[in-house]
Protein backbone atom coordinates (compact mmCIF):
# COMPACT_ATOMS: atom_id res chain seq x y z
CA UNK A 1 0.00 0.00 0.00
CA UNK A 2 1.13 3.53 -0.80
CA UNK A 3 -0.35 6.43 1.12
CA UNK A 4 0.01 10.18 0.69
CA UNK A 5 -0.46 12.09 3.93
CA UNK A 6 -0.48 15.88 3.97
CA UNK A 7 -2.37 17.43 6.86
CA UNK A 8 -2.61 20.84 8.49
CA UNK A 9 -4.54 19.34 11.42
CA UNK A 10 -2.16 16.83 13.01
CA UNK A 11 -4.80 15.24 15.26
CA UNK A 12 -4.54 11.45 15.03
CA UNK A 13 -1.59 11.66 12.63
CA UNK A 14 0.78 9.50 14.64
CA UNK A 15 -1.82 6.79 15.19
CA UNK A 16 -2.76 6.73 11.51
CA UNK A 17 0.87 6.44 10.45
CA UNK A 18 1.58 3.69 12.99
CA UNK A 19 -1.43 1.73 11.77
CA UNK A 20 -0.28 2.12 8.17
CA UNK A 21 3.18 0.94 9.14
CA UNK A 22 1.64 -2.19 10.64
CA UNK A 23 0.16 -2.86 7.19
CA UNK A 24 3.58 -2.44 5.56
CA UNK A 25 2.44 0.73 3.83
CA UNK A 26 4.85 3.25 2.37
CA UNK A 27 3.99 6.76 3.50
CA UNK A 28 4.76 9.80 1.36
CA UNK A 29 4.36 13.25 2.86
CA UNK A 30 4.95 16.92 2.21
CA UNK A 31 7.64 18.68 4.23
CA UNK A 32 5.59 19.82 7.21
CA UNK A 33 3.78 16.53 7.71
CA UNK A 34 6.95 14.53 7.08
CA UNK A 35 8.74 16.53 9.77
CA UNK A 36 5.96 15.84 12.26
CA UNK A 37 6.09 12.12 11.48
CA UNK A 38 9.85 11.88 11.69
CA UNK A 39 9.74 13.63 15.07
CA UNK A 40 7.61 10.70 16.25
CA UNK A 41 10.11 8.18 14.88
CA UNK A 42 7.93 7.21 11.93
CA UNK A 43 9.57 6.38 8.62
CA UNK A 44 8.29 8.53 5.79
CA UNK A 45 9.30 9.34 2.23
CA UNK A 46 9.12 12.84 0.74
CA UNK A 47 6.63 13.36 -2.06
CA UNK A 48 9.62 14.23 -4.21
CA UNK A 49 10.43 10.50 -4.14
CA UNK A 50 7.30 10.07 -6.26
CA UNK A 51 7.72 13.09 -8.49
CA UNK A 52 11.48 13.35 -8.86
CA UNK A 53 10.94 17.07 -8.40
CA UNK A 54 11.50 19.21 -5.29
CA UNK A 55 8.94 21.35 -3.52
CA UNK A 56 9.28 24.87 -4.89
CA UNK A 57 7.96 28.42 -4.47
CA UNK A 58 8.13 28.29 -0.68
CA UNK A 59 5.92 25.21 -0.69
CA UNK A 60 3.26 26.56 -3.03
CA UNK A 61 3.99 23.68 -5.41
CA UNK A 62 4.49 20.34 -3.71
CA UNK A 63 2.11 17.71 -5.03
CA UNK A 64 0.89 19.14 -8.34
CA UNK A 65 2.60 16.61 -10.59
CA UNK A 66 1.44 13.91 -13.05
CA UNK A 67 3.31 11.20 -11.13
CA UNK A 68 1.05 11.82 -8.15
CA UNK A 69 -2.24 12.49 -9.88
CA UNK A 70 -1.90 9.65 -12.38
CA UNK A 71 -1.16 7.34 -9.45
CA UNK A 72 -4.37 8.47 -7.77
CA UNK A 73 -6.66 8.65 -10.80
CA UNK A 74 -5.69 5.42 -12.58
CA UNK A 75 -8.52 2.87 -12.55
CA UNK A 76 -7.06 -0.48 -11.57
CA UNK A 77 -9.49 -2.49 -13.72
CA UNK A 78 -8.64 -0.59 -16.91
CA UNK A 79 -5.68 -2.17 -18.65
CA UNK A 80 -4.85 0.98 -20.59
CA UNK A 81 -4.51 2.92 -17.32
CA UNK A 82 -2.21 0.30 -15.86
CA UNK A 83 -0.19 0.30 -19.07
CA UNK A 84 0.21 4.08 -18.85
CA UNK A 85 1.42 3.81 -15.26
CA UNK A 86 3.94 1.15 -16.22
CA UNK A 87 5.12 3.02 -19.30
CA UNK A 88 5.81 6.17 -17.28
CA UNK A 89 7.10 4.36 -14.19
CA UNK A 90 4.31 5.69 -11.96
CA UNK A 91 3.26 3.88 -8.81
CA UNK A 92 -0.46 3.66 -7.95
CA UNK A 93 -1.58 5.46 -4.80
CA UNK A 94 -3.96 3.58 -2.49
CA UNK A 95 -4.76 6.16 0.18
CA UNK A 96 -4.92 9.95 0.37
CA UNK A 97 -5.15 11.48 3.84
CA UNK A 98 -5.42 15.24 3.49
CA UNK A 99 -6.92 18.15 5.34
CA UNK A 100 -6.59 21.75 4.34
CA UNK A 101 -4.93 24.93 5.48
CA UNK A 102 -6.96 26.75 8.18
CA UNK A 103 -8.39 29.27 5.75
CA UNK A 104 -11.62 29.97 7.65
CA UNK A 105 -9.74 30.45 10.92
CA UNK A 106 -7.40 32.91 9.24
CA UNK A 107 -10.08 35.14 7.73
CA UNK A 108 -12.03 35.03 11.00
CA UNK A 109 -9.19 36.91 12.70
CA UNK A 110 -9.98 40.63 12.82
CA UNK A 111 -6.34 41.48 12.10
CA UNK A 112 -5.98 39.09 9.15
CA UNK A 113 -4.62 40.68 6.00
CA UNK A 114 -5.63 39.87 2.47
CA UNK A 115 -2.12 38.51 1.78
CA UNK A 116 -2.38 36.17 4.76
CA UNK A 117 -5.74 34.94 3.53
CA UNK A 118 -4.37 34.28 0.06
CA UNK A 119 -1.54 32.18 1.46
CA UNK A 120 -4.09 30.00 3.27
CA UNK A 121 -5.91 29.09 0.06
CA UNK A 122 -5.06 25.43 -0.40
CA UNK A 123 -4.46 24.34 -4.00
CA UNK A 124 -2.65 21.01 -3.83
CA UNK A 125 -4.70 19.64 -0.96
CA UNK A 126 -8.00 20.40 -2.65
CA UNK A 127 -6.76 18.83 -5.88
CA UNK A 128 -5.64 15.68 -4.07
CA UNK A 129 -9.03 15.32 -2.39
CA UNK A 130 -10.93 15.84 -5.63
CA UNK A 131 -8.78 13.32 -7.49
CA UNK A 132 -9.07 10.70 -4.76
CA UNK A 133 -12.83 11.25 -4.46
CA UNK A 134 -13.21 10.76 -8.21
CA UNK A 135 -11.46 7.40 -7.92
CA UNK A 136 -12.73 6.32 -4.50
CA UNK A 137 -13.24 2.77 -5.78
CA UNK A 138 -9.46 2.38 -5.80
CA UNK A 139 -8.29 5.07 -3.39
CA UNK A 140 -9.23 5.49 0.27
CA UNK A 141 -9.96 9.15 1.01
CA UNK A 142 -9.46 10.46 4.55
CA UNK A 143 -10.23 14.11 5.21
CA UNK A 144 -11.34 13.98 8.86
CA UNK A 145 -9.22 12.72 11.76
CA UNK A 146 -12.23 10.98 13.31
CA UNK A 147 -12.34 8.63 10.32
CA UNK A 148 -8.77 7.37 10.75
CA UNK A 149 -9.34 4.79 13.48
CA UNK A 150 -12.44 3.02 12.06
CA UNK A 151 -10.89 2.82 8.60
CA UNK A 152 -7.64 1.38 9.89
CA UNK A 153 -9.56 -1.06 12.07
CA UNK A 154 -11.51 -2.26 9.03
CA UNK A 155 -8.31 -2.57 7.04
CA UNK A 156 -6.60 -4.55 9.79
CA UNK A 157 -9.55 -6.86 10.42
CA UNK A 158 -10.63 -7.51 6.83
CA UNK A 159 -7.50 -6.74 4.84
CA UNK A 160 -9.38 -4.18 2.77
CA UNK A 161 -11.75 -1.25 3.03
CA UNK A 162 -15.21 -1.96 1.63
CA UNK A 163 -16.84 -0.11 -1.26
CA UNK A 164 -19.52 1.25 1.07
CA UNK A 165 -16.92 2.68 3.44
CA UNK A 166 -14.93 4.17 0.57
CA UNK A 167 -18.07 5.77 -0.86
CA UNK A 168 -19.08 7.16 2.53
CA UNK A 169 -15.66 8.70 3.08
CA UNK A 170 -15.23 10.20 -0.37
CA UNK A 171 -16.62 13.76 -0.50
CA UNK A 172 -18.04 13.22 -3.99
CA UNK A 173 -21.30 14.99 -3.18
CA UNK A 174 -19.38 17.99 -1.88
CA UNK A 175 -17.24 18.18 -5.00
CA UNK A 176 -20.39 18.23 -7.14
CA UNK A 177 -22.11 20.71 -4.82
CA UNK A 178 -19.16 23.08 -4.95
CA UNK A 179 -18.97 22.92 -8.74
CA UNK A 180 -22.71 23.61 -9.04
CA UNK A 181 -22.67 26.19 -6.26
CA UNK A 182 -19.88 28.31 -7.68
CA UNK A 183 -22.28 30.00 -10.09
CA UNK A 184 -24.52 30.88 -7.16
CA UNK A 185 -21.55 32.25 -5.21
CA UNK A 186 -20.26 34.39 -8.06
CA UNK A 187 -23.70 35.73 -8.89
CA UNK A 188 -24.70 36.53 -5.34
CA UNK A 189 -21.56 37.81 -3.69
CA UNK A 190 -21.12 40.80 -5.93
CA UNK A 191 -24.44 42.22 -4.74
CA UNK A 192 -23.93 41.77 -1.00
CA UNK A 193 -23.54 44.98 0.97
CA UNK A 194 -20.47 45.27 3.17
CA UNK A 195 -18.20 43.02 1.10
CA UNK A 196 -15.26 44.88 -0.38
CA UNK A 197 -13.40 43.77 -3.49
CA UNK A 198 -10.85 41.74 -1.53
CA UNK A 199 -13.51 40.21 0.68
CA UNK A 200 -15.47 39.09 -2.37
CA UNK A 201 -12.38 37.45 -3.87
CA UNK A 202 -11.70 35.57 -0.66
CA UNK A 203 -15.33 34.54 -0.36
CA UNK A 204 -15.37 33.18 -3.89
CA UNK A 205 -12.21 31.25 -3.09
CA UNK A 206 -14.03 29.57 -0.23
CA UNK A 207 -16.75 28.47 -2.62
CA UNK A 208 -14.10 26.90 -4.80
CA UNK A 209 -11.79 25.44 -2.24
CA UNK A 210 -13.36 24.52 1.09
CA UNK A 211 -13.99 20.79 1.40
CA UNK A 212 -15.12 20.26 4.97
CA UNK A 213 -18.33 18.37 4.17
CA UNK A 214 -20.50 21.46 3.78
CA UNK A 215 -22.14 22.48 0.51
CA UNK A 216 -21.03 25.54 -1.40
CA UNK A 217 -24.39 27.26 -1.06
CA UNK A 218 -24.19 26.92 2.70
CA UNK A 219 -20.73 28.44 2.61
CA UNK A 220 -21.95 31.41 0.61
CA UNK A 221 -24.78 32.00 3.06
CA UNK A 222 -22.35 31.80 5.97
CA UNK A 223 -20.02 34.32 4.38
CA UNK A 224 -22.81 36.81 3.79
Kindly label every feature range from the protein language model.
Residues 1-50:
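N-terminal glycine-/serine-/threonine-rich phosphate-binding loop
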Residues 5, 26-31, 45-49, 74, ...:
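General beta-strand structural signal in soluble alpha/beta enzymes
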Residues 90-186:
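Internal alpha/beta core interface subdomains
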Residues 180-183, 207-211, 222:
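Intrinsic disorder/low-complexity segments
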Residues 216-223:
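Short, intrinsically disordered C-terminal tails of secreted or membrane-associated proteins
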